[in-house]
UniProtKB/Swiss-Prot annotation:
EC number(s) from the headed UniProt entry: 7.-.-.-
Domain ABC transporter intervals: 6-244
Main localisation: membrane
SUPFAM superfamilies associated with the record: P-loop containing nucleoside triphosphate hydrolases
Complex and partners: Forms a stable energy-coupling factor (ECF) transporter complex composed of 2 membrane-embedded substrate-binding proteins (S component), 2 ATP-binding proteins (A component) and 2 transmembrane proteins (T component).
Gene: ecfA1
A molecular function GO annotation: ATP hydrolysis activity
Membrane topology: Peripheral membrane protein
Protein name: Energy-coupling factor transporter ATP-binding protein EcfA1
């Protein structure tokens, strides 16, 4: 049995521009994502992370190389609907993904288009809204909700399609801190409680701390790969790429440089407090 949800094999993607040289946005990427994994892809603007993510449910097809989703080649047109049913996608702006005037109708939109029976749709909509803690808002108009609530409705709309994997392309970029926290908690729960494979594209380091594994992209290539502790403890390399690290990791780095004997892989405030309390 194939343990991988998504496999990228020597993937190259070129943006073809009229009268200009084509721009390589993804440059020979090899990446396997396991079923049930929570993977974060980090990178600054223009690193290729969003372009790569759009290959993971066949929104884009590679110029060279192959992408497999649940063992299906994205270049095979007969696989497209199965792939998009298996791997849902949530974008930055929830307003661009909401199509109905009532929350529960919006969540029902995807299953209706799959031709699913009304009783089954009702069941899926209720279940999806409960999973994102938005069931009590099912009869609200989406435009009356906060940004974080709208994004959770967009996630519910994907969940109603029963995907095995959800790709989040900077889903908190347009949200305030409280909305961001709501959405990140929802993403974590979908992974931990329901076993859904999560691929989160972000530039917020505090979100990346929650991942099983982090991939860092720069100039279309994967330049680092490892656990959050392995990635963030390498502060000079992250800074060199143009990325920040979590505040507590940066503080640990500065304390080390000042001669304080403290671990370099501290990620959270609690870990920092514990480390400082153990100093003599």
């Amino acid at each position: 049995m194939n343990e991988n949800m998504i496999e990228c094999k020597n993937v190259v993607y070129k943006y073809e521009k009229a009268e200009e040289e084509s721009k390589v946005a993804v440059d020979n990427v090899n990446l396997d994502i396991k079923k049930g994994e929570f993977l974060v892809v980090l990178g600054h603007n223009g690193s290729g992370k969003s372009t790569l993510s759009k290959h993971m449910n066949a929104l884009l097809l590679p110029s060279e190389g192959t992408v497999y989703v649940s063992g299906m080649d994205t270049k095979d047109e007969s696989n497209i609907w199965k792939i998009r049913n298996n791997a849902g996608m949530v974008f930055q702006n929830p307003d661009n993904q909401l199509v109905a005037t009532i929350v529960e109708e919006d969540v029902a939109f995807g299953p209706e288009n799959l031709g699913i029976a009304p009783d089954e749709i009702r069941s899926r909509v209720d279940e999806a809204l409960k999973r994102v803690n938005m069931y009590e808002y099912r009869r609200y108009a989406p435009h009356l909700l906060s940004g974080g609530q709208k994004q959770r409705i967009a996630i519910a709309g994907i969940l109603a399609m029963r995907p095995e994997c959800i790709i989040f392309d900077e889903p908190t970029a347009m949200l305030d801190p409280s909305g961001r926290k709501e959405v990140v908690n929802t993403i974590k729960e979908l992974n931990e409680r329901y076993g859904i494979t999560i691929i989160l594209i972000t530039h917020y380091m505090e979100e990346a701390v929650e991942a099983d594994r982090i991939v860092v992209m720069d100039k279309g290539k994967i330049v680092m790969e490892g656990t959050p502790r392995e990635i963030f403890s390498n502060v000079p390399l992250m800074k060199n790429i143009g990325l920040d690290v979590p505040q507590m990791t940066e503080l640990a780095y500065e304390l080390q440089n000042s001669g304080v004997n403290i671990a370099s892989d501290i990620l959270t405030i609690d870990e920092m407090v514990n480390a400082l309390c153990q100093l003599k």
